Amino acid sequence: MMARPGYRKFHGFKSTVFGKSIPRKYLLDYAQARELAAEFNTLVEDGGIGLLIGEVGIGKTTAIRAFKEELGERSCRVCYVGSVKHSTAVLQDFVLQMGYQPSHQRANLLRQLSKAISQTWVEQRKKTLLVLDDAQATEESLLEDLRLLSNFDIDSQEPLILLLVGHPSLQNRLRKPIHLALWDRLRMLFRLEGLSLEETHQYIEQHLKAAGGPVELFTPEARVAVFEQSQGIPRRINRLALEAVKRSARNKVNTIDENMIAVAAGVFDGV
């Protein structure tokens, strides 16, 4: 049996702390997350195309995962492609998730996807949500294919919902003349921002709770220092806080203060 990492044993954590994902019940419930959830729900209800943007590590994928879990398979079929791939590979991935054996020809893939979306609506009365993450790196031709795919309707309903997710540069890209037809069809545009100071306090506490550790491990001053170094970006918070936790265990220190945060930040030359 693999031994627990030293910090888990020293601080009494039951699981990894400040990891990439935590159980949904521990996700921070804050104003911006609630606003985004409302936008997601409206998009699914009304159909159409949505755009979610934010800096690297801001929590876009986490927000999508939480919404997908909440949505389940009740009224919508969700297909997610999250890594940068060639446009044909993206379409093949979507087709495979819809339950079809994907073709090797692009035109056939679009027909397969269109048929699967229509069939899901007609037979199950379920819409299909296609989520394309890291869309800022997507080929121009794929964006156009997805726009054309979203054109059809059945019984005055739009059975396809398309959600593009990416860096802020994606918004500028979609506003170029080549993609204006897609831009004009957007029904949702949401930019995810970093956490506030108070939200950063709560975020740290939620992660400590999720791992079963001491919620007072970080002093108030340390939490302020984490916020200042990370700018409230969750991935940076996680990296900095975990480094501080590991160092505190190695030094057999039961409380993390702002000085330890400064040392931890130096490892990454800031975060």
Residue positions per predicted region:
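Conserved AAA+ ATPase "SRH/arginine-finger" region at the nucleotide-binding site
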Residues: 81-83, 174, 187-200
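Short regulatory helix/loop adjacent to the ATP-binding pocket of P-loop NTPases
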Residues: 68-70, 170-185
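A short, basic N-terminal segment
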Residues: 1-46, 266, 270
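AAA+/P-loop NTPase substrate/partner-engagement loops
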Residues: 72-97
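Short hydrophobic/aromatic beta-strand immediately N-terminal to the Walker A/P-loop
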Residues: 50-53, 80, 131
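Mid-core helix/loop region of P-loop NTP-binding domains shared across ATPases and GTPases
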Residues: 8, 86-93, 101-145, 153-158, ...
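Walker A/P-loop nucleotide-binding motif
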Residues: 45-66
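C-terminal alpha-helical "lid" subdomain
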Residues: 2-6, 65, 181, 198-205, ...
